[in-house]
A protein has these predicted regions:
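Short, glycine/polar-rich helix-capping loops at beta-to-alpha or helix-loop-helix junctions
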Residues: 168-181
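Short beta->alpha connector loops at strand-helix junctions that form conserved
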Residues: 127, 144, 170, 183-195
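Generic N-terminal amphipathic, Lys/Arg-enriched alpha-helix
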Residues: 1-23
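Conserved small/polar residues in nucleotide/adenosyl-binding loops
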Residues: 203-210
Length: 212
């Protein structure tokens, strides 16, 4: 997929703000290409992370499921159908609804996750959701600083078995996630070995989400 001018501009701005990521230009662009291609084909994005990474997952979903830098207007065809369906309520829906990029953060759904954790296997809650939500052509985005979280690894294996692509935000060349990824963004430091850099990993990730 050809990168749009807008995407190119955002990538350049990101690298200007965070020069340390310059060595990961191809990985960042590759992740964009994979996710964008899935959306164009009617796919969706599932996101998994623990702790601060779970907060990142929720943040990403919040930006994808509504307008972010631009308001995403509804397709005219849908707007017309809404107006036909309800002349009374349709105008409000047309005014306020926005096009969404389907995304699900799997750290939520407490009834499902606690039931599955209690009845089955706590570390496979993400994998169970991938099994239920995922379809071939969808993308799983996994966020793990160390890449060693078992619940993340279980989810990645399940996604691959379903024919999904797996993109990871992880750290360090020894991250166990790497063999499971079609593309990855590996920070310059080996974050799995240098625990002091975990905060820097989180800082860069949050910075990219908030400012790009």
């Amino acid at each position: 997929m050809k990168q749009t001018d807008g995407a190119k501009k955002q990538l350049e701005l990101l690298l200007q703000r965070y020069p340390i990521l310059a060595g990961q230009r191809d990985e960042i662009d590759g992740a964009y290409q994979i996710i964008a291609a899935s959306y164009e084909a009617g796919g969706k994005l599932l996101i998994a992370g623990n702790g601060g990474s779970a907060a990142d997952a929720e943040h990403i979903v919040g930006e994808l499921m509504k307008g972010f830098k631009k308001t995403r207007r509804l397709d005219e065809a849908l707007a017309e159908r809404l107006l036909r369906e309800s002349p009374e309520l349709g105008p409000d829906l047309v005014q306020h609804l926005q096009k969404a990029l389907p995304a699900i953060a799997m750290d939520g759904h407490p009834a499902l996750t606690t039931a599955y954790a209690n009845d089955c296997a706590p570390l496979m809650c993400f994998a169970q959701q991938v099994n239920g939500y995922g379809r071939a052509g969808d993308v799983l985005l996994v966020i793990s600083t160390s890449g060693k979280s078992k619940n993340i690894l279980y989810a990645a294996v399940t996604a691959r078995a379903l024919g999904m692509k797996v993109v990871g935000l992880t750290g360090g060349a020894d991250s166990p996630l790497l063999p499971l990824l079609v593309d990855q963004e590996v920070y310059p430091e080996n974050l799995a070995q240098l625990g002091r850099n975990e905060a820097r990993s989180e800082e860069r990730r949050v910075g990219k989400e908030c400012r790009s």
